[in-house]
Amino acid sequence: MTSVIFLGTPEFAVPILEGLIAQHYDILAVMTQPDRKVGRKQRLAASPVKQAAQKHDIPVLQPEKLSGSPELAQAIAMAPDLIVTAAYGQFLPTKFLEAAKIIAVNVHGSLLPKYRGGAPIQYSIMNGDSETGVTIIEMVKKMDAGDMFAQAKLPLTRADDTGTVFAKLSLLGRDLLLETLPKIIAGTATRTPQDPDKVTFSPTITKEQEHLNIHLPAKALDQWIRALRPDVGGYVYLNGQRTKLWAITPLSAGSTLPAGSIVERDKHRLVMVAGQQTTFQVDELQPAGKAKQSIADFLNGPGQQLVSGQQVITDDPE
């Protein structure tokens, strides 16, 4: 039985771990991020991967920082055949990668060499890509730079957001890994070096990027909203109040009003201007301190004062 140390943290990694267990790989330990406080009540919560490991009585290691930790020494001493990672969230020291008797591999959520880094799914949606995918690569010291063993593609549509794509890619990644590992173990897998001229990066989304730019064309604005959904949500300042836009529909009609202005408003519909004289319909939003609302609920409640012609979204809260 091939022994594995598995590293992962979010829901994306859970089907991959479950797949390895189902295929009778010997999971010596699971390494995941420490429990974090979540939600308004700031309750301590285990990562999805930790929860999955505990269901199978697999030992769990949770170093705050892996490098130089007792958990690192413990993992190296296990001398696994394979190290498998999927969205773990920490840098892996070279001496740990070298502890694998066969190889250390990573399931990465993009079609490498495009989108190395921590937010490949968000950037693929944000940039309006027609497809994304997963890549099985060798783990090396340089981030996401190892040779590629396999790729699988996934079409993207306007119905997708980061949540839906995460779910689809986790299953695609599981299947691709389970198909590829036997070839890697047997030494028959083909290695393809990444083309350095085609490398792009997808750094972790910053707080500043959550502030939506109303001067973008409506199509690009929609892409940003979907890229930031469902976890954080993108926001604007609507009448000076921080308001999250959860769903919009770009429209074909244009408008000469300034970006952030209301083109049309009735009890059930709100049409606004984005950049380059494009327009969009607001479908779902969330005023500060309140729950998500349909546009009808908003217009018949907190948004009653809005009228056509007003410029209500501004770059700053003043």
Curated annotation (Swiss-Prot):
Q: Name one GO molecular function term.
A: methionyl-tRNA formyltransferase activity
Q: Which CDD domains match?
A: FMT_core_Met-tRNA-FMT_N, Met_tRNA_FMT_C
The reply on keyword Coiled coil is no
Q: Which Gene3D superfamilies match?
A: 3.40.50.12230
- Please give the InterPro entries that the UniProt record associates with this protein: Fmt (IPR005794), Formyl_trans_C (IPR005793), Formyl_transf_N (IPR002376), Formyl_transf_N_sf (IPR036477), Formyl_transferase-like_C_sf (IPR011034), Met-tRNA-FMT_C (IPR044135), Met-tRNA-FMT_N (IPR041711)
The kind of enzyme this is, by top-level EC class, is transferase
Write the Enzyme Commission number(s) for this entry: 2.1.2.9
Reaction(s) the record says it catalyses: L-methionyl-tRNA(fMet) + (6R)-10-formyltetrahydrofolate = N-formyl-L-methionyl-tRNA(fMet) + (6S)-5,6,7,8-tetrahydrofolate + H(+)
Q: Where does (6S)-5,6,7,8-tetrahydrofolate bind?
A: S110, L111, L112, P113
Q: Which UniProt keywords apply?
A: Protein biosynthesis, Transferase
What GO cellular component is one of the record's annotations? Answer: cytosol
Similarity section: Belongs to the Fmt family.
Function summary: Attaches a formyl group to the free amino group of methionyl-tRNA(fMet). The formyl group appears to play a dual role in the initiator identity of N-formylmethionyl-tRNA by promoting its recognition by IF2 and preventing the misappropriation of this tRNA by the elongation apparatus.
Q: What PANTHER family would the database entry show?
A: METHIONYL-TRNA FORMYLTRANSFERASE, METHIONYL-TRNA FORMYLTRANSFERASE, MITOCHONDRIAL
- List the protein's name: Methionyl-tRNA formyltransferase
**Species for this entry:** Lacticaseibacillus casei (strain BL23)
